[in-house]
């Protein structure tokens, strides 16, 4: 059952798809995605995204360095709190060990049959308080057979996004193989940039009025 809605909390983030709250419960802090404040015309897509996240978190329950699903009742999604900072807040500059650990984390996620699908956003990568990588925000995640051609393609796109971050913060430590992966684009990427990306930008910037470089962090 979901945690009580009258427990003390404060907002971490609010956007058109609801509020993200840090809630103080009897067993400690947890994070709640609250769809109650979502405008009526966005409630269906907000519910669909939250349901998708709940399904992915349920699938990888028990895995380290990802949120643990606590409850989902159609209005509130409760997940475990992970202490740390978003990548853009504490960049892992020159930290090869962090990027190696991040790649191992991705490999484990993919072996469990989940592709994240939203790792271009630095806000979805955490640097935990003890320096480990962690992943959050599984609203766009996909579940499937990790050996299928489609899931292997999505896993490769997840890896490409990680390598783009490594190129940003650790460029001199990219391996020859990683450089080749970055150069080789897939038809999924090309289709997204040709069709989905313009629609995404129109909706998020013209309709929803988002201004944060697609989740990488707030503008100063």
How does the language model describe each region?
Residues 128-220:
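C-lobe/activation-segment region of protein kinase-like
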Residues 36, 46-50, 56-101, 105:
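Conserved structural core of kinase catalytic domains
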Residues 5-58:
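ATP-binding glycine-rich loop module of kinase domains
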């Amino acid at each position: 059952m979901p945690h009580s809605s009258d427990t003390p909390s404060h907002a971490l983030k609010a956007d058109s798809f609801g509020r993200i709250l840090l809630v103080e419960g009897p067993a400690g802090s947890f994070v709640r995605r609250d769809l109650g404040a979502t405008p009526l015309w966005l409630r269906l897509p907000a519910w669909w995204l939250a349901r998708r996240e709940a399904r992915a978190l349920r699938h990888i329950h028990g895995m380290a360095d990802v949120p643990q699903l606590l409850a989902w009742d159609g209005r509130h999604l409760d997940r475990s709190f992970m202490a740390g900072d978003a990548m853009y807040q504490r960049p892992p500059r020159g930290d090869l060990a962090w990027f190696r650990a991040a790649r191992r984390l991705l490999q484990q996620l993919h072996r469990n049959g989940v592709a994240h699908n939203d790792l271009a956003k630095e806000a979805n990568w955490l640097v935990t308080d003890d320096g480990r990588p962690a992943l959050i925000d599984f609203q766009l995640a996909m579940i499937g057979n990790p050996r299928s051609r489609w899931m292997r393609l999505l896993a490769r796109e997840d890896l490409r996004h990680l390598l783009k971050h490594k190129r940003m913060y650790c460029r001199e430590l990219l391996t020859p193989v990683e450089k080749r992966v970055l150069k080789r684009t897939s038809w999924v990427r090309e289709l997204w940039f040709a069709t989905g990306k313009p629609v995404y930008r129109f909706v998020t910037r013209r309709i929803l009025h988002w201004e944060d470089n697609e989740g990488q962090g707030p503008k100063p």
